UniProtKB/Swiss-Prot annotation:
Source organism: Omphalotus olearius (Jack o'lantern)
Keyword Transport: no
Biased amino acid composition, Polar residues: 491-505
Protein name: L-ornithine N(5)-monooxygenase
EC numbers for this chain: 1.14.13.196
Cofactor list: FAD
Role description: L-ornithine N(5)-monooxygenase; part of the siderophore biosynthetic pathway. Omphalotus olearius produces ferrichrome A, but no other siderophore has been detected. Ferrichrome A consists of a hexapeptide ring made up of one glycine, two serine, and three N(5)-hydroxyornithine amino acid residues, the latter acylated by trans-(alpha-methyl)-glutaconic acid residues. The biosynthesis of ferrichrome A depends on the hydroxylation of ornithine to N(5)-hydroxyornithine, catalyzed by the monooxygenase omo1.
Binding site for substrate: K77, N282, E283, V284, F285, N312, S570
Alphabetic keyword roster: FAD, Flavoprotein, Monooxygenase, NADP, Oxidoreductase
Amino acid sequence: MSQMSITSQVIYDLVGLGFGPSNVAIAGALVDKWASPNSDAKSRSFQNVLFIEKHTSFQWHPGMLIPGAQMQISFLKDLATLRSPQSPITFLNYLHSQNRLASFINRGSTTPSRKEYADYLGWAARYVQDHGVKVNYGQEVIAIDEDADGLIGITSKDVTTNEIYTYKTRNLVISPGGSPRIPLTIAPLMNEPSVINDSTVLHSSAYLTSVDRLFQSLTRSSSSRRPFKIAVVGGGQSAAEVSLNLRERLSSIAFEGSVGHQVDMIIGRGSLKPSDDTPFSNEVFDPMTTDTWFGSSQHNRDRMITEYKPTNYSVVNPRTINAVRHVSPSLIYDQKVDDAIAARTLEDKTSGTSPARINIRANMRIVSLKYDDKNSTDSSSSPTTKSSSAFTLTLQNTHTPHTLHASAYDAIICATGYQRTGWIDMFKRSKRLGKHFGIGAEGAARVKLVPLDKRQRVDVDTLFDETAISSDVSSTASSSLYSVSGSDNSAASGVSGASTPLTSPSEEEGKSDVNLYISRRYRLLPVSTSSYEKTKTRDDDASEGVKMKARIYVQGVEEMTHGLSDTLLSVIGPRAGEVVEDLFAEE
């Protein structure tokens, strides 16, 4: 059966890939500009705006909307307040529209719950749609390219019907979000049918939407009522929240034996580290810090990444650490008290329920994984008893590397962060578009975002000729994306880098790197026509040498060029304002 293809006859002024918070903020800035009494003819004519979203409705981290989870930032760092406090899509306006403003004030806290913030984002998404912004949900973008007229063509596929849609736009904004990063030792299991059916291996991004199915698979045929043991890989905020929620769920399941249910947090460092959210450190997330970061040398940007990494990476909010260590009840300390009492009284618990244990497996690195599918269950067949755990992890203590530990688990949850690399593959697969940026189908070992300031914007061609790069330019316009350090298992041990290369060095080893230049206002800067002509081959169409007309922007992937706040919500409002202003700026 052939796929149906539908081509839009509209030439859009702007198409956005994705409709998460970043692009909702862009849409909000456009709606505000349209409504402004100072809007000019150009902004009033800039009305054909479309966003394409893979999910069938607006969603924001549905897998991590764990009951009781709190945001880590002030409600004032919303979609618009730092850009324009008068905007209709501020968090305060949301509260007022829901008749909860006074109640929120009475809470005495500036951080909303994650559940409430997700509802706010959905409210804002509906608002911009009601005010002229079109959103096509349920379509996954599969290709982008430039056409003969210099417009950007977008190809998407309906996630339900597989119908193919094509669109054309004068401007493009790419806000890809993050895709789950899975340790290489665990990744092969993500395609195992029995694992998929039972949700016994998950990324934390899918935790809440899959955990019920996981527990159904664990308890479906456990006639022996043996205790369960679940591994949580990672040492950051998500890992701690997932571990606490697993403990709560396991504590209500009866078991038989002297040892109850357990949750093992497998972390690469010696302990859970608290996030640095002190006022002075938080200044690194201020909008004006973006200017400092962008204008700094490569050396200084690397130094700032190292200095401020404890504000966001592989760290846990102190309140959550206290929950793991001291409260609900005293968890780890209370477990030690229980052990001492049991040993003194010779108590041997043989059945019933009791609080599940959380164990911190510190300084651990995952060496290998064995999966025994005979101990898994298939929901499509007759239930069978799980006599033992399905997964065996071989762990190596980094302090005693010659000693290996084999631990059996019933399920594995990977709270190992995200990667933001998929969007660059569309440039590499394109026939024309990628070549404007020096990216061809054959690719390079790495594609690296590099800041290019107007003060340094001599002919862009000279920046692609290493012999012509002056020492002043090369100190700022140089390799920029921070690689994850360590082995392939660095993510498995809960150690995340500040960002990942746009393409993996191991994928195309031995080839030269490509610098992908970006402006202060998040616009990708193409190689000029003369340099582009040098890359043409006999197979290229004659139209490919045309100077690029469209503008392309990226959001949420420029951490090393624009600062640590770029993948977070902290500057989402001001950034949207800057992108929209640049859209209307004259060349």
